[in-house]
Amino acid sequence: RQVVRLLDPNRPDVLTIGFARRFATYKRATLLLSDRARLARLLNDPERPVLLLFAGKAHPADEPGKALLREIKQLMLAPEFIGRVIFLDDYDLRLARWLVSGCNVWLNNPVAPLEASGTSGIKAAVNGALNLSILDGWWAEAFDGENG
């Protein structure tokens, strides 16, 4: 229910940015969090509200990946990010389907050249989302100089 409410198509005033995948350090889930004051200004602009959705899991043996999850969960509790940064628990195929079909922008910013494919961006593009990506994974092959 939370996902349906967050991705409400009747709220076109909110730009929804999605990042949902396995949490590994090279995927840089927390890159946008490096300048928190700037991020707070961007997300809380009353003229252009933005929602940043995260979902995913770390491998059980990946302690740095689990630390990234904790960092995002702590951030979403900070007063300036409540309701603007959201981590959705219990990531699975059903939730992934909702996210790739409901986000306006799909974020892909791994350390190049470590992303083998990054198929979530393909699924988001097929559903009409814009991809905000570096040239790695599938985007390195799809980009032709005229399409983005």
Residue spans for each PLM region:
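Conserved donor-binding/catalytic core segment of Leloir-type glycosyltransferases
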Residues: 12-27
